[in-house]
Amino acid sequence: MRLWVTGYRSYELGTFGDKDPKIKVIKYALHQTLKEQVDNGLEWVITGAQLGIEQWTIEVVADMKKDYPQLKLAVMLPFKQFGSQWSEDNQAKLQKLIAQSDFSESVSTKPFQSPIQLKNYQKFMLAHTDGALFFYDTEFEGKTIFDFQVVTKYQTQTPYPLVQVDMYQLQEYASELEEKMNENRYDY
């Protein structure tokens, strides 16, 4: 099974820096959710490289590969020179994350020219995955709304499972993580 993973950007979640405690909860939720998917036949995680859920997904999957060496990671970029407007630190981090993947390529062979490249990226992701995992809550809109709308429209024509982790579930994961940390049972 191939899974498209995306979700909120870091600024949409109000995270600041790599040490923000919210990131620990999100990575824990990613790990738990992806572990469940691996147990159900997940072979490939296919994600983008946006700052936020997508980059944290890359980090989590790279770490999970120690316990699940069969798990593969593809980082797909919507266009060439993706991230070139970012700060030098974020560009360096992007290159480091891409290096951790089993496969990475740009869907469009040209630098950003128009929003059609983003639509083509969405079509590519749908065509090359068997389902999706979105860290997204319809009550707290963000840029993922565009991917969410494409997936829900696609679902009207094609069986395509979508697992959504919403704010309520993130709070549940936060409580679970806190409990494990208090009992020194934190395993991620």
UniProtKB/Swiss-Prot annotation:
It comes from the Bacteria. It holds the Pfam family YpsA. Gene3D superfamilies: 3.40.50.450. InterPro entries: YspA. Signal peptide: none annotated. HAMAP family: UPF0398 (MF_01575). PANTHER family: UPF0398 PROTEIN SPR0331 (PTHR38440:SF1), UPF0398 PROTEIN YPSA (PTHR38440). Belongs to the UPF0398 family. This is UPF0398 protein LEUM_0652. It comes from Leuconostoc mesenteroides subsp. mesenteroides (strain ATCC 8293 / DSM 20343 / BCRC 11652 / CCM 1803 / JCM 6124 / NCDO 523 / NBRC 100496 / NCIMB 8023 / NCTC 12954 / NRRL B-1118 / 37Y).
